[in-house]
Protein backbone atom coordinates (compact mmCIF):
# COMPACT_ATOMS: atom_id res chain seq x y z
CA UNK A 1 0.00 0.00 0.00
CA UNK A 2 2.81 2.39 0.93
CA UNK A 3 4.47 1.50 -2.35
CA UNK A 4 1.35 2.42 -4.40
CA UNK A 5 0.85 5.62 -2.40
CA UNK A 6 4.37 6.81 -3.09
CA UNK A 7 4.92 5.50 -6.64
CA UNK A 8 1.60 5.57 -8.51
CA UNK A 9 1.69 8.70 -10.75
CA UNK A 10 -1.78 9.92 -9.67
CA UNK A 11 -1.93 8.76 -6.03
CA UNK A 12 1.59 10.18 -5.56
CA UNK A 13 0.23 13.71 -6.17
CA UNK A 14 -2.53 13.20 -3.55
CA UNK A 15 0.08 11.76 -1.17
CA UNK A 16 2.35 14.81 -1.52
CA UNK A 17 -0.61 17.18 -1.09
CA UNK A 18 -2.61 15.64 1.77
CA UNK A 19 -0.68 12.80 3.44
CA UNK A 20 3.11 13.18 3.52
CA UNK A 21 2.95 16.97 3.15
CA UNK A 22 5.39 18.59 5.62
CA UNK A 23 3.35 21.08 7.69
CA UNK A 24 4.44 23.46 10.49
CA UNK A 25 3.96 21.86 13.90
CA UNK A 26 2.26 24.91 15.43
CA UNK A 27 -0.50 25.97 13.00
CA UNK A 28 -3.71 26.83 14.87
CA UNK A 29 -7.39 26.33 14.05
CA UNK A 30 -7.23 29.46 11.87
CA UNK A 31 -5.53 27.20 9.30
CA UNK A 32 -8.60 24.91 9.16
CA UNK A 33 -10.58 27.19 6.86
CA UNK A 34 -8.79 26.13 3.66
CA UNK A 35 -10.09 22.58 3.99
CA UNK A 36 -13.52 23.88 5.08
CA UNK A 37 -13.68 26.01 1.92
CA UNK A 38 -12.90 22.88 -0.11
CA UNK A 39 -15.77 21.09 1.64
CA UNK A 40 -18.11 24.06 1.03
CA UNK A 41 -17.21 23.99 -2.68
CA UNK A 42 -17.96 20.24 -2.91
CA UNK A 43 -21.31 20.68 -1.10
CA UNK A 44 -22.26 23.61 -3.37
CA UNK A 45 -21.37 21.70 -6.56
CA UNK A 46 -23.32 18.58 -5.47
CA UNK A 47 -26.44 20.41 -4.22
CA UNK A 48 -26.29 22.74 -7.23
CA UNK A 49 -26.13 19.78 -9.61
CA UNK A 50 -29.32 18.28 -8.13
CA UNK A 51 -31.06 21.68 -8.21
CA UNK A 52 -30.09 22.14 -11.87
CA UNK A 53 -31.87 18.85 -12.68
CA UNK A 54 -35.22 20.43 -11.71
CA UNK A 55 -34.66 24.15 -12.35
CA UNK A 56 -35.75 25.90 -15.56
CA UNK A 57 -33.91 29.07 -16.61
CA UNK A 58 -36.89 30.77 -18.21
CA UNK A 59 -38.49 33.95 -16.84
CA UNK A 60 -41.98 32.41 -17.08
CA UNK A 61 -41.16 29.27 -15.08
CA UNK A 62 -37.98 29.96 -13.01
CA UNK A 63 -39.82 31.09 -9.86
CA UNK A 64 -42.37 28.25 -10.00
CA UNK A 65 -39.62 25.69 -10.72
CA UNK A 66 -37.91 26.68 -7.43
CA UNK A 67 -41.29 26.35 -5.64
CA UNK A 68 -41.72 22.94 -7.34
CA UNK A 69 -38.29 21.85 -6.05
CA UNK A 70 -39.29 22.78 -2.48
CA UNK A 71 -42.77 21.21 -2.65
CA UNK A 72 -42.68 18.22 -4.99
CA UNK A 73 -39.09 16.96 -5.26
CA UNK A 74 -37.97 14.41 -2.64
CA UNK A 75 -35.92 16.38 -0.10
CA UNK A 76 -35.90 19.27 -2.60
CA UNK A 77 -36.47 21.75 0.24
CA UNK A 78 -33.36 20.37 1.98
CA UNK A 79 -31.20 20.56 -1.16
CA UNK A 80 -32.42 24.11 -1.92
CA UNK A 81 -31.79 25.42 1.60
CA UNK A 82 -28.46 23.58 1.91
CA UNK A 83 -27.38 25.33 -1.30
CA UNK A 84 -28.63 28.78 -0.21
CA UNK A 85 -27.21 28.58 3.32
CA UNK A 86 -24.14 26.75 2.02
CA UNK A 87 -23.30 29.97 0.16
CA UNK A 88 -23.44 31.87 3.47
CA UNK A 89 -21.19 29.31 5.17
CA UNK A 90 -18.83 29.52 2.16
CA UNK A 91 -18.50 33.29 2.60
CA UNK A 92 -18.10 33.08 6.39
CA UNK A 93 -15.19 30.66 5.84
CA UNK A 94 -13.83 32.88 3.03
CA UNK A 95 -13.82 36.03 5.15
CA UNK A 96 -12.18 34.21 8.08
CA UNK A 97 -9.61 32.66 5.71
CA UNK A 98 -8.72 36.07 4.21
CA UNK A 99 -8.73 37.66 7.69
CA UNK A 100 -6.29 35.00 8.89
CA UNK A 101 -4.07 35.72 5.87
CA UNK A 102 -4.01 39.46 6.63
CA UNK A 103 -3.37 38.92 10.37
CA UNK A 104 -0.51 36.45 9.98
CA UNK A 105 1.10 38.08 6.92
CA UNK A 106 0.32 35.19 4.56
CA UNK A 107 0.08 37.77 1.74
CA UNK A 108 3.89 37.62 1.52
CA UNK A 109 3.38 34.37 -0.43
CA UNK A 110 2.49 36.56 -3.41
CA UNK A 111 1.48 33.92 -6.00
CA UNK A 112 -0.79 32.09 -3.54
CA UNK A 113 -2.28 35.39 -2.32
CA UNK A 114 -3.02 36.74 -5.82
CA UNK A 115 -4.58 33.41 -6.79
CA UNK A 116 -6.74 33.72 -3.67
CA UNK A 117 -7.92 37.20 -4.74
CA UNK A 118 -8.87 35.85 -8.19
CA UNK A 119 -10.76 33.04 -6.41
CA UNK A 120 -12.56 35.58 -4.20
CA UNK A 121 -13.73 37.53 -7.26
CA UNK A 122 -14.82 34.29 -8.98
CA UNK A 123 -16.81 33.12 -5.94
CA UNK A 124 -18.45 36.55 -5.58
CA UNK A 125 -19.44 36.52 -9.28
CA UNK A 126 -20.86 33.00 -8.93
CA UNK A 127 -22.86 33.90 -5.80
CA UNK A 128 -24.25 37.05 -7.44
CA UNK A 129 -25.46 35.12 -10.50
CA UNK A 130 -26.89 32.36 -8.29
CA UNK A 131 -28.95 34.93 -6.39
CA UNK A 132 -30.59 36.02 -9.66
CA UNK A 133 -31.77 32.50 -10.60
CA UNK A 134 -34.87 32.12 -8.33
CA UNK A 135 -36.27 35.16 -10.20
CA UNK A 136 -37.83 36.81 -7.16
CA UNK A 137 -38.15 40.58 -6.72
CA UNK A 138 -34.70 40.98 -5.15
CA UNK A 139 -33.18 38.66 -7.78
CA UNK A 140 -34.49 40.83 -10.62
CA UNK A 141 -33.78 44.22 -9.09
CA UNK A 142 -30.38 43.13 -7.72
CA UNK A 143 -29.40 41.99 -11.22
CA UNK A 144 -30.69 45.25 -12.73
CA UNK A 145 -28.88 47.52 -10.27
CA UNK A 146 -25.54 45.69 -10.19
CA UNK A 147 -25.23 45.05 -13.95
CA UNK A 148 -26.29 48.66 -14.58
CA UNK A 149 -23.17 49.82 -12.70
CA UNK A 150 -21.13 48.86 -15.78
CA UNK A 151 -22.81 51.73 -17.64
CA UNK A 152 -20.54 54.03 -15.60
CA UNK A 153 -17.59 52.89 -17.75
CA UNK A 154 -16.89 55.77 -20.16
CA UNK A 155 -17.71 55.36 -23.87
CA UNK A 156 -18.42 51.59 -23.92
CA UNK A 157 -20.55 51.38 -20.73
CA UNK A 158 -24.07 51.38 -22.21
CA UNK A 159 -23.15 48.96 -25.01
CA UNK A 160 -21.49 46.65 -22.47
CA UNK A 161 -24.58 46.57 -20.21
CA UNK A 162 -26.92 45.78 -23.13
CA UNK A 163 -24.49 43.09 -24.28
CA UNK A 164 -24.55 41.46 -20.82
CA UNK A 165 -28.35 41.76 -20.60
CA UNK A 166 -28.83 40.35 -24.11
CA UNK A 167 -31.42 43.07 -24.74
CA UNK A 168 -32.58 46.42 -23.41
CA UNK A 169 -33.40 45.19 -19.91
CA UNK A 170 -32.83 42.22 -17.58
CA UNK A 171 -34.97 39.54 -19.21
CA UNK A 172 -35.11 35.93 -20.43
CA UNK A 173 -31.72 36.12 -22.20
CA UNK A 174 -30.07 37.48 -19.02
CA UNK A 175 -31.50 34.70 -16.84
CA UNK A 176 -30.43 31.96 -19.29
CA UNK A 177 -26.84 33.19 -19.55
CA UNK A 178 -26.60 33.75 -15.78
CA UNK A 179 -27.66 30.13 -15.25
CA UNK A 180 -25.04 28.94 -17.77
CA UNK A 181 -22.30 30.98 -16.07
CA UNK A 182 -23.47 29.98 -12.58
CA UNK A 183 -23.21 26.33 -13.61
CA UNK A 184 -19.75 26.51 -15.21
CA UNK A 185 -17.97 28.87 -12.77
CA UNK A 186 -17.72 26.43 -9.81
CA UNK A 187 -15.75 24.04 -12.03
CA UNK A 188 -13.44 26.88 -13.07
CA UNK A 189 -13.13 27.73 -9.35
CA UNK A 190 -12.16 24.09 -8.64
CA UNK A 191 -9.35 24.36 -11.22
CA UNK A 192 -8.20 27.67 -9.69
CA UNK A 193 -8.23 26.04 -6.22
CA UNK A 194 -5.78 23.41 -7.49
CA UNK A 195 -3.50 26.19 -8.78
CA UNK A 196 -3.89 27.96 -5.40
CA UNK A 197 -2.75 24.75 -3.65
CA UNK A 198 0.08 24.26 -6.15
CA UNK A 199 1.46 27.71 -5.32
CA UNK A 200 0.97 27.11 -1.58
CA UNK A 201 2.92 23.84 -1.66
CA UNK A 202 5.80 25.56 -3.48
CA UNK A 203 6.50 27.65 -0.36
CA UNK A 204 4.80 25.66 2.40
CA UNK A 205 2.32 27.03 4.93
CA UNK A 206 2.86 30.08 7.10
CA UNK A 207 2.43 29.70 10.89
CA UNK A 208 1.20 31.85 13.84
CA UNK A 209 4.71 33.13 14.71
CA UNK A 210 5.44 34.26 11.16
CA UNK A 211 8.88 32.60 11.47
CA UNK A 212 10.45 30.03 9.13
CA UNK A 213 9.27 26.57 10.22
CA UNK A 214 11.51 24.38 8.02
CA UNK A 215 13.33 23.08 11.11
CA UNK A 216 10.11 21.85 12.73
CA UNK A 217 7.70 20.08 10.36
CA UNK A 218 5.24 17.24 10.92
CA UNK A 219 3.32 15.12 8.34
CA UNK A 220 -0.13 16.45 7.41
CA UNK A 221 -1.70 13.02 8.03
CA UNK A 222 -2.72 12.07 10.72
CA UNK A 223 -2.11 15.30 12.68
CA UNK A 224 -3.94 17.84 10.52
CA UNK A 225 -6.42 15.46 8.89
CA UNK A 226 -7.90 14.76 12.33
CA UNK A 227 -7.72 18.47 13.23
CA UNK A 228 -9.49 19.42 9.98
CA UNK A 229 -12.12 16.76 10.66
CA UNK A 230 -13.13 18.55 13.87
CA UNK A 231 -13.61 21.74 11.81
CA UNK A 232 -15.66 19.75 9.29
CA UNK A 233 -17.97 18.46 12.05
CA UNK A 234 -18.49 21.98 13.45
CA UNK A 235 -19.16 23.39 9.95
CA UNK A 236 -21.68 20.65 9.17
CA UNK A 237 -23.39 21.10 12.54
CA UNK A 238 -23.74 24.89 12.11
CA UNK A 239 -24.89 24.41 8.48
CA UNK A 240 -27.56 21.89 9.45
CA UNK A 241 -28.83 24.02 12.37
CA UNK A 242 -29.09 26.96 9.96
CA UNK A 243 -30.73 24.88 7.21
CA UNK A 244 -33.20 22.94 9.37
CA UNK A 245 -34.19 25.52 11.99
CA UNK A 246 -33.57 28.96 10.43
CA UNK A 247 -33.53 28.40 6.63
CA UNK A 248 -34.67 31.94 5.74
CA UNK A 249 -32.88 33.96 8.42
CA UNK A 250 -30.14 35.18 6.01
CA UNK A 251 -32.44 35.61 3.01
CA UNK A 252 -34.68 38.48 1.93
CA UNK A 253 -38.49 38.17 2.24
CA UNK A 254 -38.83 40.15 -1.04
CA UNK A 255 -37.41 37.17 -2.91
CA UNK A 256 -40.59 35.19 -2.14
CA UNK A 257 -42.44 37.60 -4.45
CA UNK A 258 -42.07 36.79 -8.18
CA UNK A 259 -40.02 39.30 -10.20
CA UNK A 260 -42.04 42.28 -11.40
CA UNK A 261 -40.27 44.88 -13.59
CA UNK A 262 -43.13 47.37 -12.92
CA UNK A 263 -42.80 47.33 -9.13
CA UNK A 264 -39.55 48.43 -7.47
CA UNK A 265 -38.95 47.10 -3.92
CA UNK A 266 -38.65 49.90 -1.31
CA UNK A 267 -35.07 48.89 -0.52
CA UNK A 268 -32.85 47.02 -2.98
CA UNK A 269 -29.99 45.19 -1.28
CA UNK A 270 -27.79 42.18 -2.09
CA UNK A 271 -27.16 39.14 0.13
CA UNK A 272 -25.49 39.86 3.52
CA UNK A 273 -22.00 38.86 2.33
CA UNK A 274 -21.94 41.69 -0.25
CA UNK A 275 -23.30 44.40 2.06
CA UNK A 276 -19.88 45.77 3.10
CA UNK A 277 -18.93 46.37 -0.56
CA UNK A 278 -22.44 47.66 -1.34
CA UNK A 279 -22.10 50.21 1.50
CA UNK A 280 -18.77 51.43 0.05
CA UNK A 281 -20.40 51.69 -3.41
CA UNK A 282 -23.32 53.76 -2.05
CA UNK A 283 -21.15 56.05 0.07
CA UNK A 284 -19.78 57.81 -3.04
CA UNK A 285 -22.31 60.11 -4.79
CA UNK A 286 -20.60 59.69 -8.19
CA UNK A 287 -21.52 56.53 -10.16
CA UNK A 288 -18.08 55.81 -11.66
CA UNK A 289 -16.38 56.69 -8.37
CA UNK A 290 -18.66 54.27 -6.55
CA UNK A 291 -17.91 51.45 -8.99
CA UNK A 292 -14.14 52.04 -8.65
CA UNK A 293 -14.43 52.08 -4.83
CA UNK A 294 -16.45 48.84 -5.00
CA UNK A 295 -13.75 47.07 -7.05
CA UNK A 296 -10.95 48.57 -4.94
CA UNK A 297 -12.59 47.35 -1.71
CA UNK A 298 -11.53 43.82 -2.74
CA UNK A 299 -8.61 44.63 -5.05
CA UNK A 300 -6.88 46.53 -2.22
CA UNK A 301 -5.92 43.09 -0.86
CA UNK A 302 -3.47 42.81 -3.79
CA UNK A 303 -1.61 45.85 -2.40
CA UNK A 304 -1.06 44.15 0.98
CA UNK A 305 2.45 42.83 0.15
CA UNK A 306 3.50 46.34 -1.03
CA UNK A 307 2.06 48.01 2.09
CA UNK A 308 3.92 45.66 4.46
CA UNK A 309 6.51 47.84 6.23
CA UNK A 310 7.25 45.73 9.32
CA UNK A 311 10.36 43.58 9.72
CA UNK A 312 8.07 40.93 11.23
CA UNK A 313 5.66 38.91 9.14
CA UNK A 314 2.70 38.27 11.46
CA UNK A 315 0.83 40.60 13.83
CA UNK A 316 1.46 38.16 16.72
CA UNK A 317 4.08 40.40 18.37
CA UNK A 318 2.87 43.77 16.98
CA UNK A 319 0.31 45.34 19.37
CA UNK A 320 -0.13 48.67 17.52
CA UNK A 321 -0.93 47.07 14.15
CA UNK A 322 -3.06 44.49 15.98
CA UNK A 323 -5.21 47.33 17.31
CA UNK A 324 -5.54 48.74 13.76
CA UNK A 325 -6.50 45.28 12.49
CA UNK A 326 -9.33 44.83 15.00
CA UNK A 327 -10.60 48.37 14.32
CA UNK A 328 -10.68 47.35 10.63
CA UNK A 329 -12.70 44.23 11.49
CA UNK A 330 -15.16 46.36 13.51
CA UNK A 331 -15.33 48.80 10.57
CA UNK A 332 -16.29 45.92 8.23
CA UNK A 333 -19.12 44.95 10.60
CA UNK A 334 -20.32 48.59 10.55
CA UNK A 335 -20.18 48.64 6.72
CA UNK A 336 -22.17 45.37 6.59
CA UNK A 337 -24.83 46.89 8.87
CA UNK A 338 -24.98 50.13 6.84
CA UNK A 339 -25.29 48.22 3.54
CA UNK A 340 -28.58 46.79 4.79
CA UNK A 341 -30.01 50.17 5.88
CA UNK A 342 -32.01 52.65 3.74
CA UNK A 343 -30.20 55.58 2.10
CA UNK A 344 -31.10 58.32 4.60
CA UNK A 345 -29.65 60.26 7.53
CA UNK A 346 -27.76 59.15 9.66
CA UNK A 347 -26.84 56.01 7.68
CA UNK A 348 -25.37 57.95 4.73
CA UNK A 349 -22.80 59.79 6.87
CA UNK A 350 -21.95 56.66 8.91
CA UNK A 351 -21.38 54.74 5.65
CA UNK A 352 -19.12 57.48 4.27
CA UNK A 353 -17.09 57.64 7.50
CA UNK A 354 -16.75 53.83 7.62
CA UNK A 355 -15.70 53.71 3.93
CA UNK A 356 -13.01 56.36 4.47
CA UNK A 357 -11.84 54.51 7.61
CA UNK A 358 -11.63 51.21 5.67
CA UNK A 359 -9.21 52.54 3.04
CA UNK A 360 -7.30 54.77 5.50
CA UNK A 361 -6.55 51.92 7.92
CA UNK A 362 -5.26 49.61 5.17
CA UNK A 363 -3.32 52.13 3.05
CA UNK A 364 -2.03 54.61 5.67
CA UNK A 365 -2.41 53.58 9.31
CA UNK A 366 -1.24 49.94 9.21
CA UNK A 367 1.97 50.69 7.22
CA UNK A 368 2.78 53.61 9.59
CA UNK A 369 2.12 51.37 12.62
CA UNK A 370 4.56 48.82 11.14
CA UNK A 371 7.31 51.45 10.87
CA UNK A 372 6.65 52.70 14.43
CA UNK A 373 6.94 49.12 15.74
CA UNK A 374 10.25 48.67 13.89
CA UNK A 375 11.60 51.75 15.70
CA UNK A 376 10.23 50.70 19.10
CA UNK A 377 11.76 47.24 18.79
CA UNK A 378 15.00 48.50 17.21
CA UNK A 379 14.46 46.33 14.14
CA UNK A 380 15.91 48.89 11.72
Curated annotation (Swiss-Prot):
UniProt remark on cofactor binding: Binds 2 heme b groups non-covalently.
GO biological processes: mitochondrial electron transport, ubiquinol to cytochrome c
Cofactor: heme b
Residues holding a ubiquinone: 201
Pfam family, one: Cytochrome_B
Gene3D superfamilies, A to Z: Cytochrome Bc1 Complex, Chain C
Segments passing through the bilayer: 33-53, 77-98, 113-133, 178-198, 226-246, 288-308, 320-340, 347-367
Gene Ontology molecular function: any one: ubiquinol-cytochrome-c reductase activity
Chain positions recorded as heme b b562 binding sites: 83, 182
Function: Component of the ubiquinol-cytochrome c reductase complex (complex III or cytochrome b-c1 complex) that is part of the mitochondrial respiratory chain. The b-c1 complex mediates electron transfer from ubiquinol to cytochrome c. Contributes to the generation of a proton gradient across the mitochondrial membrane that is then used for ATP synthesis.
Oligomer and partners: The cytochrome bc1 complex contains 11 subunits: 3 respiratory subunits (MT-CYB, CYC1 and UQCRFS1), 2 core proteins (UQCRC1 and UQCRC2) and 6 low-molecular weight proteins (UQCRH/QCR6, UQCRB/QCR7, UQCRQ/QCR8, UQCR10/QCR9, UQCR11/QCR10 and a cleavage product of UQCRFS1). This cytochrome bc1 complex then forms a dimer.
Name by which UniProt lists this protein: Cytochrome b
